[in-house]
Design a protein with these regions (language model features):
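Short, Lys/Arg-enriched N-terminal segments with co-localized hydrophobic residues
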Residues: 1-11
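Generic early N-terminus positional signal peaking at residue ~5-7
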Residues: 6, 16-17, 34-35
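Coiled-coil-like amphipathic alpha-helices with heptad-repeat character
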Residues: 8-9, 24, 36
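Positively charged n-region of N-terminal signal peptides that target proteins for export
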Residues: 11-15, 151
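Sec-dependent N-terminal signal peptides
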Residues: 15-25
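Sec/Tat signal peptide C-region and signal peptidase I cleavage site
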Residues: 26-30
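Subset of outer-membrane beta-barrel
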Residues: 31-325
């Protein structure tokens, strides 16, 4: 029995190592900014959203971080459920849910789902004559496995299926997220690497297949020893060098007031650039790119809240609630 268990652990370790090797060995061409399934770019974790909308390196008991780096579920308490709500554009409804469970001391699995409903919209002809209404919805389902490769390094993979419905048109896609994470408790350094949305459409809206939003990311976090301050820097869209380095950088800072409470703030250069609006001779992002948030832990319950801007027409509030059974 001992040798059987040891063999299974070695096989899991080799499988995860081989899969994660693809993260660094696959050369990816730059992709166009026009992609389908762009709702997969929206943040789910309120803590990550507060730190600029992208963070793959903080080491926290936060079940929603699996949407950002699958390796991070290894730090989540066994049998944890998480619910998410996000305000987005007017008339839309956005949410997500996840469940995480430990297999043993080194392995964890989880299930996730997310959706966005754009509500009812007017259907018009080319000459702007109304012909009725239609609805649009996006959603994705996924399963995650993570494994502790060493004392300090974990690897994870999420396989997911996504679908999009726009009136009587629909599209489907399959993809995987690959992630690695390093954490040293003594030095309080942590590093993450992620390849998100590796895959593509398996059914197009019409005849032409479109890309899905592939995103290669590298991040680092460091808590100052003896201080409540922790700083994070994340490089995003490393597969697309159409932009300058400043637009690829996401910065965030945590003030860890206690084990039960934190406040956070961040800045996302890419988001600020994409949402700039011109008015006469002036161009302004109107606060886009800046984000704030806070979180607290009460025994088995955790509550995280973040505020940011992810659409030119409105600001967003993200709320995570998790409970450990």
């Amino acid at each position: 029995m001992y040798f059987c268990r040891q063999y299974q652990e070695e096989m899991m370790k080799k499988t995860v190592l081989y899969t994660l090797f693809l993260l660094f060995s696959t050369m990816v061409k730059a992709q166009d900014s026009e992609t389908a399934f762009n709702f997969l770019r929206l943040p789910v974790s309120a803590h990550a959203a507060a730190l600029g909308g992208e963070n793959i390196s903080i080491c926290e008991d936060d079940a929603a971080l699996v949407f950002h780096n699958p390796a991070l579920i290894n730090y989540v308490e066994d049998r944890t459920m998480n619910l998410n709500m996000m305000t987005y554009m007017q008339g839309t409804l956005t949410g997500a849910a996840s469940y995480t469970q430990a297999i043993n001391d080194r392995a964890t699995w989880g299930l996730q789902g997310r959706f966005i409903s754009y509500g009812e919209m007017k259907q018009t002809t080319y000459d702007n004559q109304e012909t009725g209404t239609f609805r649009a919805n996006d959603f994705a389902l996924g399963g995650t496995f993570a494994y502790g490769l060493t004392e300090h390094i974990s690897g994870g993979i999420t396989a997911k299926w996504a679908a999009s419905y726009i009136g009587h048109y629909n599209s489907m896609a399959v993809a995987v997220d690959l992630g690695m994470h390093y954490f040293n408790e003594e030095s309080q350094w942590s590093v993450g690497a992620v390849a998100r949305n590796l895959g593509g459409q398996i059914k197009a809206y019409e005849d032409d297949f479109e890309r899905i939003p592939l995103d290669l990311q590298l991040g680092v976090s460091k808590r100052l020893i003896g201080s409540p301050l922790r700083f994070s820097a994340t490089l995003v869209r490393l597969n697309d060098w159409e932009y300058g380095i400043g637009k690829h950088l996401v910065l965030g800072a945590d003030l860890l007031l206690s084990e039960q409470f934190y406040v956070a703030a961040g800045y996302n250069g890419m988001r600020a650039s994409e949402m700039k609006i011109s008015s006469g001779d002036d161009t302004s992002a109107h606060g886009a790119g800046l984000s704030l948030g806070a979180g607290m832990t009460l025994e088995r319950m955790k509550l995280h809240v973040a505020y940011g801007k992810y659409h030119v027409s409105s600001t967003s509030l993200i709320i995570n609630f998790s409970y450990t059974l």
